[in-house]
Curated annotation (Swiss-Prot):
Protein name: Monothiol glutaredoxin-S2
Role summary: May only reduce GSH-thiol disulfides, but not protein disulfides.
Cell compartment(s), UniProt: Cytoplasm
GO molecular function: 2 iron, 2 sulfur cluster binding; metal ion binding
Gene: GRXS2
Binding, [2Fe-2S] cluster: C48
Cellular component GO terms held in the UniProt record: cytoplasm
Length: 125
């Protein structure tokens, strides 16, 4: 199934595979909806090591993140829909773009990550 999903350019959300061709929602609308629905969202290409580091850091501080793994053509469509020259992986906290791994590390090292996560209700504890 994964090989079929990758070949068809589908997007994986957790264990759910979403076929963008079968949806009426445009990529920009889908990105906006996903960012609004979850306090912490990571958009990444499947297997991206930087996204893995981001997930580990967020989990280490007690945050629950929604991770949207993109494959094939879906990755390019969603990346373009992020706008502003955003590249994958891309992190959003409370609907605001943080950036990639460097942005996340900057927040963490400055001591602003946990307070921001607490502010948006993303901490498990």
């Amino acid at each position: 199934m994964q090989a079929v999903a990758a070949a068809a350019g589908m997007m994986r959300r957790g264990s759910l595979t979403i076929d963008p061709a079968g949806e009426e929602e445009a990529p920009a609308e889908r990105v906006g909806r996903l960012v609004r629905e979850s306090p912490v969202v990571v958009f990444a290409r499947r297997g991206c090591y930087m996204a893995h580091v981001m997930r580990r850091l967020l989990a280490a501080v007690g945050a629950h993140a929604t991770v949207i793994e993109l494959e094939g053509g879906a990755a390019e469509e969603e990346e373009a829909a992020l706008g502003g020259g955003a590249a994958l992986p891309a992190l959003f906290v409370g609907g605001d773009p943080v950036g990639g791994l460097e942005g996340l590390m900057g927040l963490h090292l400055s001591g602003r990550l946990v307070p921001r996560l607490r502010e948006v209700g993303a901490l498990c504890t």
